Amino acid sequence: KNATIVTQSADFDMASEGVMRSAFGLQGQKCSACSRVYVDKRVAEPFLKLLVEKTKALVIGNPAQRDVFVGPVINKAAVEKYERSVAAAKRDGSLLIGGELLQEPPLDRGYFVSPAIAQLPLSHALFQEELFLPFLSVGIVDSFDRALEESNRSHLGLTGGLFSNDEREIERFFDEMEAGVLYVN
């Protein structure tokens, strides 16, 4: 359950592209996928707008085709977990995009779901679950300190990401983030 932090000094185009690619590349079915993003409340609206736009533009289909970015999830159990996660997001937060099982030809010959982005309360269980799905949980925070605290609140932490142009934030991230591999910008 890898976390990324987006601060008010971030380049939002770069941050939205990086988060989208990390969350939804290989359908989120990789150990290094970004599953949680913590966004400074002062920049949440413009960042999330770009993230949703970029996610909406993703091509879903046969991953062997050149222009396809999102392929199928692995099996029916993954679809069921996706549907439970979407239902929880709708019930407890706000689903910004996604949530559909895609069954129109040619997507009817596989387990295709639309990449989902959900804004949730910071205490929500989905921030702690390792889903291995194209599902991104968004938490809005009021400070960089809170973003670091929330990022480190998981017992999982293979990778951690930061989008910031503030050198002090970058230094603190490298010193305080509890993850094996760290990425900046």
Q: Predicted segment positions?
A:
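Conserved C-terminal structural/oligomerization subdomain of aldehyde/semialdehyde dehydrogenase
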Residues: 59, 105-185
